[in-house]
């Protein structure tokens, strides 16, 4: 890991970034659990080699867990790798990313590391954990923020009477409100994914995921800041769909990464 941390730090200017939590622990674990069920045999074997007894549900939360580490790498360098900023009406371009990078540039960098058979095992393990996490992040609409309200962090709302912000509602409040464990929610969401949806969702790429999140972003800002059952009901299908797609796409992406003969994620199954 020391090699990767050093090279990444040298390649990216250190800088404080907008705080972001992405999906909360339950949401991220759900995406990892769904992904686990859709790995190819080759990908599953490689994941086991890198993670040992850990599974993708645990790997999915690891980059957020490490935010408590006081090291500059976690507090500054890695902080902006959980989101992107795309202003309304614009399209994402990597050249517009800040000097320290963003979720899309980090995904590209970690993809190259994981595909490099000569990279140290610790570097590839770090890359795998970040890839699983970042793909989940890119499916949270407020992690494709427009740059004017810190991805909904500045939008003050109440959730069943409790003061919070819109970002937190989407990260965790709507998921936790259902009172299901991550494994129960992953089971329930997995049962409703059809074979046709699995194929369709596996054919996309990070730019597609990002465009989907940006399109949803426009629909989730409430006219009334007092949020409760109506808001939860209105957006439950969107939340479920993003978690499902993220899980399928994590698996498809890893299947592709670990099977170099496949030209696209959809063919690596």
Regions found by a protein language model. Give the residues of each.
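Positively charged n-region of N-terminal signal peptides that target proteins for export
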Residues: 1-5
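N-terminal signal peptide c-region/cleavage motif recognized by signal peptidases
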Residues: 17-19
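N-terminal, motif-rich segments that launch catalysis or mediate targeting to/interaction with membranes
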Residues: 21-134, 141-269
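Bacterial N-terminal signal peptides
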Residues: 6-15
């Amino acid at each position: 890991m020391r090699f990767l941390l050093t090279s990444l730090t040298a390649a990216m200017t250190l800088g404080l970034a907008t705080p972001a939590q992405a999906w909360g622990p339950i949401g991220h674990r759900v995406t990892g659990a769904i992904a686990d069920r859709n790995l190819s045999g080759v990908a599953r074997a490689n994941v086991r080699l890198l993670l040992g007894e850990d599974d993708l549900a645990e790997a999915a939360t690891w980059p957020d867990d490490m935010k408590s580490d006081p090291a500059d790498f976690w507090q500054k360098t890695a902080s902006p790798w959980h989101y992107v900023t795309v202003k309304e009406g614009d399209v994402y371009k990597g050249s517009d990313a800040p000097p320290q990078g963003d979720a899309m540039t980090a995904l590209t960098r970690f993809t190259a590391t994981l595909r490099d058979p000569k990279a140290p095992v610790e570097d590839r393990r770090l890359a795998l954990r970040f890839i699983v996490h970042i793909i989940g992040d890119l499916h949270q609409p407020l992690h494709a923020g427009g740059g004017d309200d810190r991805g909904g962090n500045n939008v003050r709302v109440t959730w069943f009477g409790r003061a919070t912000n819109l970002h937190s509602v989407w990260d965790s409040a709507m998921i936790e409100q259902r009172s299901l464990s991550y494994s129960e929610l992953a089971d329930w969401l997995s049962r409703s994914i059809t074979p046709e949806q699995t194929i369709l969702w596996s054919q996309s790429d990070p730019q597609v995921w990002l465009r989907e999140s940006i399109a949803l972003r426009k629909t989730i800002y409430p006219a009334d800041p007092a949020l409760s059952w109506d808001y939860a009901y209105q957006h439950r299908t969107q939340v479920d769909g993003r978690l499902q797609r993220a899980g399928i796409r994590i698996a498809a992406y890893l299947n592709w990464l670990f099977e170099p003969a496949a030209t696209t994620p959809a063919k690596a199954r």
